[in-house]
């Protein structure tokens, strides 16, 4: 969703500032992770507004209908309160969402992966999604239940990206020689990347179930290793100003950092106007974010989006 000004971010700020005030997230100053300026991976940016304005109205309508995002949520029974929150909030904006659980949960409908191992859950979820929906969706977004996502901003970022190309997007982190997309910020794969990954899942030499190492590594690193064998490399997603749009922390933490580092530019210094994800939220904060992003409006400010992504048919989204 594209706005004439930073009204979107201000809406988020007005809602999420209550999270920061209520939770009082400690007094420890936390940096913005391991974002470095000498990454070897590509930095992919969102399209400029001018490019969108050049598209005819008919083409915009066609684009809004053609972008279909399938959301994958990996959950465990202990996450039931977070599970409920994401089910009631942002996942309603996905074109399709499935919850993949480590075991059967009576309270919510889910697909039982029959394992507590997050890497095995991720593998099985990706295989299920590809086998069942490869002809229906061109982008696949995987997240934790602690993540809040603005799907319209994701679609806007992907607007000029070709899903027939091997995209593997999100917030990139470097670990030794391995560059990977952090699961904490959400992981986006194009249908081409899904095809390549699926072709490797049955080849233990290239994509082992246990990582092929003496010690266990995280599921997002193991995914990167498998994709690397398929010629798919991690790419950091940024807005047109170079700010990260997949965030591994909450808005509250970003605001605290901005108040310390940029006291005269808290809003501008916090995060991107076109942010796609924030992580580390409680169930209550999920609902506050939902209010700030989709409900709160400043009277007198005109929203003039050049492109509107239509909600899925029958969706109960906001």
Curated annotation (Swiss-Prot):
Cytoplasmic side: 1-6
Keyword set, alphabetical order: Chaperone, Membrane, Signal-anchor, Transmembrane, Transmembrane helix
Family stated for the protein in its record: Belongs to the glycosyltransferase 31 family. Beta3-Gal-T subfamily.
Name of this chain's protein: C1GALT1-specific chaperone 1
Topological relation to the membrane, as annotated: Single-pass type II membrane protein
Gene Ontology BP term (one): protein O-linked glycosylation
Subunit composition and interactions: Associates with core 1 beta-3-galactosyltransferase (C1GALT1), probably not with the soluble active form.
Coarse class of the protein's main subcellular location: membrane
Compartment(s): Membrane
Membrane-crossing residue ranges in chain numbering: 7-26
GO MF assignments: glycoprotein-N-acetylgalactosamine 3-beta-galactosyltransferase activity
The keyword DNA damage appears for this protein: no
Residue intervals annotated with topology Lumenal: 27-318
Gene: C1GALT1C1
Assigned GO CC terms: membrane
UniProt function note: Probable chaperone required for the generation of 1 O-glycan Gal-beta1-3GalNAc-alpha1-Ser/Thr (T antigen), which is a precursor for many extended O-glycans in glycoproteins. Probably acts as a specific molecular chaperone assisting the folding/stability of core 1 beta-3-galactosyltransferase (C1GALT1).
Matching InterPro entries: C1GALT1/C1GALT1_chp1
């Amino acid at each position: 969703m594209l706005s004439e000004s930073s009204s979107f971010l201000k809406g988020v700020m007005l809602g999420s500032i209550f999270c920061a005030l209520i939770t009082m997230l400690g007094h420890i100053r936390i940096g913005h992770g391991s974002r470095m300026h000498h990454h070897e991976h590509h930095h992919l940016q969102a399209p400029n507004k001018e490019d969108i304005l050049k598209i005819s109205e008919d083409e915009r309508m066609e684009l809004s209908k053609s972008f279909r995002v399938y959301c994958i949520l990996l959950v465990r029974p202990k996450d039931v309160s977070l599970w409920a929150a994401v089910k009631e909030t942002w996942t309603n904006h996905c074109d399709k969402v499935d919850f993949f659980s480590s075991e059967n949960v009576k309270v919510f409908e889910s697909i039982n992966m029959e394992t507590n191992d997050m890497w095995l859950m991720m593998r099985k979820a990706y295989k299920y999604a590809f086998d069942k929906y490869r002809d229906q969706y061109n982008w696949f977004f995987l997240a934790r239940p602690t993540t809040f996502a603005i799907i319209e901003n994701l679609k806007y970022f992907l607007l000029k990206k070709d899903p027939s190309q091997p995209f593997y997007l999100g917030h990139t982190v470097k670990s030794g020689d391995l560059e990977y997309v952090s699961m904490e910020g959400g992981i986006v794969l194009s249908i081409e990347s899904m095809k390549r990954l699926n072709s490797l899942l049955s080849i233990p030499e290239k994509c082992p179930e246990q990582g092929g190492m003496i010690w266990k590594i995280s599921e997002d690193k193991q995914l990167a290793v498998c994709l690397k064998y398929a010629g798919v490399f991690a790419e950091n997603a940024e807005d047109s100003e170079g700010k990260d749009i997949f965030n591994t922390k909450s808005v509250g933490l970003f605001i605290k950092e901005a108040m310390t580092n940029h006291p005269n530019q808290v809003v501008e210094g916090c995060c991107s106007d076109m942010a796609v994800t924030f992580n580390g939220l409680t169930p209550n904060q999920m609902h506050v974010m939902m209010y700030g992003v989709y409900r709160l409006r400043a009277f007198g400010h005109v929203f003039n989006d050049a492109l509107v992504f239509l909600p899925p048919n029958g969706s109960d989204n906001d």
